Amino acid sequence: MPKQKSFRLGLIGHPVSHSKSPEIFAKFFEQHFQAQAQINSKSLSEHIGTADYHLFDLPDLTQFNAWLECEIKKPSPLVGFNVTVPHKTAIIPYLDELSPAAHHLQAVNTVVIQYNTNTQKPYLVGHNTDVIGFEKSLEQIIAISLSTTTQNDIPDALNSPNHVSPQFAIILGNGGSAKAVRYVLNQHHIPNQTWHRGKVINQIDMQLSEAISLNTSIPHHALIVQTTPVGMWPNTEDCIDFPFEQLNHTHWAIDLVYNPETTAFMKHCINQGATVMNGKYMLQKQAEAAWEIFHQNL
């Protein structure tokens, strides 16, 4: 696709009204046009293009093709979109190609729209940047545990820091975000289990740690990652069922929900002494990675 003076990006999912992505991408757009102005020796007061980030609330994907056809016909081209719950896996059959990470995880959160130069038909390529986002979050936790930084330097981390890096992890949920979390934990050789609807459905590298269940004690120095949308605005009082009484100051907890900033899940963990973090840092880092992908295709 030729360089676009004006373009659009967006987010599909349900619900999406709470999303902070428009704010994040507005900063990316500003940086993009500042760079374009310097290249073209123009001031920002001159017209060098526009960019918008739209929220598309799609409860399901039955009308996805019709939605896409409508959007790509608009004057300002839709060059890509992000994908959030509940469509990170469901979107795959609608795509033409997957990046290696997206193919491995069978989960997509970033889609680039390319166009066949002959037919002008859209060609959709799915990527996964959640892996990068959670990787950065885990690096922050490890940095705290190794005392290479102070907790005040870590965005959205609350409670007294735990000075031992996670030795075990429990993933709550089994959606697209959970797949990215599991992948990163495996790359770091951190034994992990996936809990979904009150059952242990997946356990990895368990020779390094005794298998645990909802009815047994959670090991010390465990990391609990809440990947479901439970507790997300506007249902801020909702909380996933979890044996919080087993937590203490040796535990870490990350809730990938970022609105509200302190979820009901996080409050329960804090009350038990665990160190917690919300999903804002992961959101920012996965968005930066997604923007790099979009920017390469402008």
Put a short name on every predicted segment:
Residues K136, Q140, T275-L298:
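Active-site capping/gating segments
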